[in-house]
């Protein structure tokens, strides 16, 4: 019994040692600095929102040489700027215009597609259950059986005063 326990302990330690030294281990992968990039939430972030028209910071913070020269031209009179330069300055500050933000998304198509896929799969499951899981319909549901049952109830004169048999004309053999 001692040998069996010692063998188990050795295999357990060997498994842990290989997991600790292998690079494919999940524990070792979590020590890599490239797993997740941390974002400093104390600094202002950029958001395109209709309810807050001016974000806390500009859309582009890292400016190229052309962008820097355009920012220098911005400090001068705006009448000297061309339309393209004004649009470029706007795009440095904001990612989207109001009309772009108000434009409806196509997300409803994905939602409806998911709903229809779910309904289709549910229909297939119900159809499969009707074929292979549920028992056959009882014979009492057949129209022939219901007609025989009706004839038997009329022959027995069930509820003759105000009910079923009161509406049957026994002399003519038809409903009143």
UniProtKB/Swiss-Prot annotation:
One of its GO terms (biological process) is mitochondrial electron transport, cytochrome c to oxygen. Residues 1-28 form a transit peptide. Keywords: Membrane, Mitochondrion, Mitochondrion inner membrane, Transit peptide, Transmembrane, Transmembrane helix. Pathway: Energy metabolism; oxidative phosphorylation. GO terms for cellular component: mitochondrial inner membrane; respiratory chain complex IV. Residues 133-176 are mitochondrial intermembrane. It is a single-pass membrane protein. Belongs to the cytochrome c oxidase IV family. Component of the cytochrome c oxidase, the last enzyme in the mitochondrial electron transport chain which drives oxidative phosphorylation. The respiratory chain contains 3 multisubunit complexes succinate dehydrogenase (complex II, CII), ubiquinol-cytochrome c oxidoreductase (cytochrome b-c1 complex, complex III, CIII) and cytochrome c oxidase (complex IV, CIV), that cooperate to transfer electrons derived from NADH and succinate to molecular oxygen, creating an electrochemical gradient over the inner membrane that drives transmembrane transport and the ATP synthase. Component of the cytochrome c oxidase (complex IV, CIV), a multisubunit enzyme composed of 14 subunits. The complex is composed of a catalytic core of 3 subunits MT-CO1, MT-CO2 and MT-CO3, encoded in the mitochondrial DNA, and 11 supernumerary subunits COX4I, COX5A, COX5B, COX6A, COX6B, COX6C, COX7A, COX7B, COX7C, COX8 and NDUFA4, which are encoded in the nuclear genome. This is Cytochrome c oxidase subunit 4 isoform 2, mitochondrial.
């Amino acid at each position: 019994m001692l040998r069996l326990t010692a063998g188990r302990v050795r295999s357990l330690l060997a498994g842990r040692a290989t997991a600790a030294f292998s690079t494919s281990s999940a524990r070792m992968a979590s020590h890599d600095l490239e797993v997740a990039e941390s974002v400093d939430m104390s600094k202002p972030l950029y958001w395109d929102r209709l309810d807050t028209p001016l974000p806390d910071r500009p859309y582009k913070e890292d400016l190229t040489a052309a962008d820097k020269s355009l920012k220098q031209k911005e400090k001068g009179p705006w009448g000297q700027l061309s339309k393209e330069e004004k649009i470029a300055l706007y795009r440095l500050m904001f990612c989207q215009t109001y009309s772009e933000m108000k434009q409806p998304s196509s997300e409803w198509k994905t939602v409806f597609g998911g709903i229809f896929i779910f309904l289709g799969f549910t229909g297939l499951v119900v159809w499969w259950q009707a074929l292979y899981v549920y028992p056959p319909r009882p014979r009492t549901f057949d129209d022939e059986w219901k007609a025989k049952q009706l004839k038997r109830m009329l022959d027995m004169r069930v509820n003759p005063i105000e009910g079923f048999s009161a509406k049957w004309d026994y002399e003519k053999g038809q409903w009143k």
